[in-house]
């Protein structure tokens, strides 16, 4: 049908239709970093010169706009949400099965939406999360005996929300709470009560699931999510016992364990979703009982914790990481994209974020996008630009 539709129109007509649709979105945000003589070269030549050390600020601006182009092309009202490949998948069997990865990938795809004038691209994300929550409610009830809805680290066209693949990567039951952050951000940019009513069931369901997953931690009497894991990272075990961090390499006979409780990212996500649900319910004048339930649980979540080496704790105890330089930095969610930790408001915790990044600063692949934003919030322009250049080459 698409081909027949296109065949009835001339090339100039199709081009103009494309421009009319695309340019209002693309032109909603401009960035000007200046130009050098390299800007006149073709892309391959410019990349070669950047690898050789040349400065090409215009290329960096284009790199920024390319990310916006991908979102414009990939996520529009009536389409599926942006996933790991989307319209550029050229094989019937793509990597990661062509699915959505929910423990950072889909979130990073939508980071430019609100701040660069692409708010309309989040409509397909809202539809996606609504579909996902219906499946997630069955998983929450059937797998955990919990209210609300859940999603783990990956899903597909059938909206699978159960733990899939391995516990190592799959045990991340609060990824629904992370997805909903994009809807909350859209509301913050457009504080419309009708929109808040649309997204409130998703906020509420995620909060209810979070409440039902809480258990009391015996030492400090904190409420922690159990079971869970820090996305795709794990601690070192020897003979079934966890090892505490002591600055030494892990033993040769250590194995990786992910399954635990009270991981930092869970605490951070629950703090956000509980706070947002309370605010939304108050604005809408509903769910007093739920607000009261959250009010009891929220103060008992664990605080942000700092390890003896000054880094931010990834787990509730200072376990020895199986891979100290792991590419994921899930425990830094509170600094970006959340703002629970800030340089001005919580400088000691922000310094712990900085020290964590010193260890976890491999900018390869998708992880570079997260680390660019972390360095930007730290005010480290030099390192931020170093990561950008690394990704460009």
Predicted regions located by residue number:
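Acidic/histidine-rich catalytic neighborhood
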Residues: 205, 209-280
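Acidic/polar, glycine-enriched structural segments that form the non-catalytic walls/loops
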Residues: 1-100, 118-123, 129-139, 282-286, ...
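Extended, hydrophobic/aromatic-rich amphipathic alpha-helical segments that build helical scaffolds
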Residues: 60-74, 176-185, 201, 205-210
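Short, well-structured active-site flanking segments
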Residues: 76-85, 122-123, 190-197, 205, ...
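Beta-sheet entry/capping signal
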Residues: 61, 68-70, 221-224, 370
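Acidic/His metal-coordination segments adjacent to aromatic residues that form catalytic metal sites
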Residues: 86-97, 151-171, 228-262, 318, ...
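Active-site core of glycosidic bond-cleaving carbohydrate-active enzymes
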Residues: 102-105, 113-138, 142, 158, ...
